[in-house]
């Protein structure tokens, strides 16, 4: 991690998180500018954080009493103090930082745009391999694969020849594969990775 980019809760930096430094919105803008309900919704939807309300209450209180939160360590410490202590391999700030990063960089929208574009330029019998690192990404990818797999459904009461029913334009090569224990031991960041692979077998839909 590069501390100056503000992605890490373990390295002190400005609360930035922009992958593209030319864009305006930063993580600090969100943390200091969003109202209570909007922040809670963000942490629930993009971080799947069950302690979202506790965290946001702590953020709002900090803003009212001490002012803006401008450093990554400030926010991480605040989160650590706000939620119940429990044994976990993940830092308590992980989900909040994930939610902020996703929002700042519009990561889910990027995935939704890239998948159909990648499929469109894929040659016949070409394969599309996609790795996700959290459930929100994987859900989008899984649904895209499922959409491509689903053939047009026609009622049995409609007189149509089977040959005229459009078949799925893909076949699944890897439904979902997780890293081995050996791989995780060499690269701890691989622990949440999921690989899905499809092959294009017709132009289809």
Residue ranges and their predicted role:
Residues 1-205:
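S-adenosyl-L-methionine-dependent methyltransferase catalytic core, i.e., the SAM/SAH-binding region
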